[in-house]
Each structure stands twice: as structure tokens, then as C-alpha cells.
UniProtKB/Swiss-Prot annotation:
Gene name of the record: panB2
Function: Catalyzes the reversible reaction in which hydroxymethyl group from 5,10-methylenetetrahydrofolate is transferred onto alpha-ketoisovalerate to form ketopantoate.
Name this polypeptide is given: 3-methyl-2-oxobutanoate hydroxymethyltransferase 2
Species name: Methylibium petroleiphilum (strain ATCC BAA-1232 / LMG 22953 / PM1)
Reactions this protein catalyses: 3-methyl-2-oxobutanoate + (6R)-5,10-methylene-5,6,7,8-tetrahydrofolate + H2O = 2-dehydropantoate + (6S)-5,6,7,8-tetrahydrofolate
Positions of Mg(2+) binding: 58, 97, 128
Amino acid sequence: MSSHSSPADTPSARKPVTLHTLREMHARGEKIAMITAYDASFAALVDTAGVDCILVGDSLGMVLKGQSSTLSVTMEQIGYHTRSTSRGTKAAFLIADMPFGSYQENPVQALRNAGTLMAAGAQMVKLEGGGWTPETVNFLVERGVPVCAHLGLTPQSVHALGGYRIQGKDEAGAATLRRHAKALADAGAAMMVLELMPSRVAREVQADNPGLMTIGIGAGAGTAGQVLVLHDMLGVTRGRLPRFVRNFMDSATSIEDAVRRYVAAVKDGSFPDETLHAY
């Protein structure tokens, strides 16, 4: 059995979202709505629903492969899903995760693997961690690779962090996050995912780096935008979900409608609700 149409043929009424577009949105205070997708069909759907950014996340290891962490995801797998997602994306800005082991060795390794993902259709790559990463970020940015950093709960470091725990709860931890964020912004990171940290800390990171586009997930409403895993916000993921997840399918008539509701809630500031989805 075959389909008579391809997601790549889906028309788009929107102009393509570029890094310049996102910076203009941030400058005028418009929130950025990001969501994960891993294939052409869902990419076309969320693109049509109006998301600004699509993240081909290494979360695919958990939501697609059924694994307990993201650590076993490979460059080959991210590349495959980036190519597939790119084919269904007409307007949204496409970001690809750099999987564990693809950038930690040295900046040259990072550039080689980032180049592979850009060739697969990514317009930006995302890498995790503070500390040692600014050198790598700067190396990539100077060579034309836009970078999204990732601080707070960094899933690739789950064992070093002792599990999926809130980061920056005490002042020492908060100060470390602020310091790492400043170093990454100074190194040229255009965007930064802030995951599982107190709202206060995320607000401070954004205030300290006004030109940086911070994207929250479990970091409160004070960031420049929000991201959720598609399967989480559709209620597909089984088991106990993190507090910061909201099921947008509850009142939706279709998956596309659920994603539209998510985009609207991010844009109007009703998601996340600080009393329900923040720490």
C-alpha cells in the first residue's frame, strides 16, 4: 500500500523562518514556539500548524526507540531523521541535536559532524553542556555553523548528574548556570535551551544575555520561547510525565489543532503556567 501524496508536496503559506527572522521576533518580544519532529509526515504537520522551529532531538532514542536515555543515539540515526524531517519542512527553522560522542573529542570532530547534519538539512545544531563547550561553540560559529547551546538538565550527562534532577536549585548551582550561559553567549551561541531549572534562574540567564534566544523546557515563562517533545504534548508518551508537560490533545480536534493550540499558548504567554508547569 502506498500514499498518493508526499509530505514534501504540502504547500506552505508562510515565508521560511530564518535565524534573522527569529532574532527579529526576539527583539520585538514575540515568543518562539519550538517542537520536536523526527520524520517528514509529522514535520509537515507541525510546520503547517505554525511552529517557528523544529528540533530533530536525540530524544528520539527514548520516544521512538524505547530506550531509557539519549546516550545510544548515533550520528547515523540523527542524520537519517534530519534528512527525513527536512523533506517535510517548508517554513520552520530546522535544528538538529548533536548526539553524545559526536562533539566531545575536539572542535574539529564537532565541525565534521555538524557539517554532516547541515548537509542533511539542519540550519542549526544543538549541543549540550557548559564548562568546556564555549571553545567548541566559537569554533563552529566562526566557521558558519549556527549553534544552539543547552544548559540545566542535560540528558547526555544524566549519569554524571545523578538522574533527571532540577538544576540550579541552590545559589552555587544557579551561579554556575549563569556563568556558563554568559560564556556560551559570548562564544557566539545564538540560542540556548534551558531545561529543568527554577524560573528565577532562567529569567536571570535571559536578563544577563538580552540578545540570546533562550528556549525553556521546565524553566518557566521568562524565556524567549518554549520547546516540548511532540509525543509528550500529544499524550502519546506512556508513564509519568514531567510537571512541565501539558497535554494539548485534551481539548483538540486533531493533532494539527493540538499543535496550533500549543503555538498559540506559547505566543500569548498562557503556556507555561508558572503555577502548574514551573519550578
